């Protein structure tokens, strides 16, 4: 296999990706247990993260390492703003602030944006490709777990300007391989991608619910699924 940036990032972050999926909050989320209070805190934290990423990408959009992967259709700030308006109301900015882990994450993005812009590639790759890859599944889980009846609250997962996720991801990976980088720079970007995963994990860990709360929600979730299955069975009998 050719040692391209896209391949190096995929292979070099496999362990970090697995670790991130095993953080308690993420495992609960994937299992269909989503606490609305924790979820809206996550949305708020992601708002600050994406504001930082998108500010630095814009500032460095003509940098040789950023220009090939600068796609404004990926921007999440506006969609996160819609979600925050849904959960907190029109004055949502008065109610949110970055958590301690989020502040560290945001500071990291601004620091490399000013000093080593090529490392922004790692953060863009980690967040945006992750959002595109699992977004629709996570959206379905979130809507079902929080019993969201209308279309609000999960705009973050909607990429309205991207018609074909798979085609776009292929385009993005091809763009990664167009970036003029030395072998050392490629390894630095892979290392930064692992740092990005760690920063995300720290942010998720702050959102962990208590064990009792998780167990209670799991039981409630199981009961709801059983009731739905029971009703479906009765309907078939009738």
Swiss-Prot record:
Its EC number is 1.14.14.18. GO terms for biological process: heme catabolic process; heme oxidation; photosynthesis; response to oxidative stress. Its main location: plastid. It comes from the Eukaryota. The keyword Disulfide bond does not apply. Gene3D superfamilies: Heme oxygenase-like. PROSITE patterns: HEME_OXYGENASE. Catalyzes the opening of the heme ring with the release of iron. Key enzyme in the synthesis of the chromophoric part of the photosynthetic antennae. Belongs to the heme oxygenase family. This is Heme oxygenase.
């Amino acid at each position: 296999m050719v040692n391209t940036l896209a391949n190096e990032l995929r292979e070099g972050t496999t362990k970090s990706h697995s670790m991130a999926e095993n953080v308690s909050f993420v495992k609960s989320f994937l299992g269909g247990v989503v606490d609305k209070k924790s979820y809206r805190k996550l949305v708020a934290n992601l708002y600050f993260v994406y504001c930082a990423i998108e500010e630095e990408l814009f500032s460095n959009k003509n940098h040789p390492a950023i220009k090939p992967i600068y796609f404004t259709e990926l921007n999440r700030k506006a969609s996160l703003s819609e979600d925050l308006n849904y959960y907190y109301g029109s004055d949502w900015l008065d109610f949110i602030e970055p958590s301690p882990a989020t502040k560290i994450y945001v500071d990291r993005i601004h620091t490399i944006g000013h000093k080593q812009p090529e490392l922004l590639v790692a953060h863009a790759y980690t967040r945006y490709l992750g959002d595109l890859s699992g977004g629709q599944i996570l959206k379905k889980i979130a809507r079902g777990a929080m019993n969201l009846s209308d279309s609000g609250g999960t705009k973050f997962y909607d990429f309205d300007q991207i018609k074909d996720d798979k085609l776009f991801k292929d385009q993005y990976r091809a763009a990664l391989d167009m970036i003029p980088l030395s072998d050392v720079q490629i390894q630095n970007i892979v290392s930064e991608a692992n740092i990005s995963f760690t920063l995300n994990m720290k942010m998720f860990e702050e959102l962990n619910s208590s064990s009792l709360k998780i167990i209670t929600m799991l039981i409630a979730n199981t009961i709801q699924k059983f009731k739905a299955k029971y009703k479906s069975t009765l309907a078939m009998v009738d």
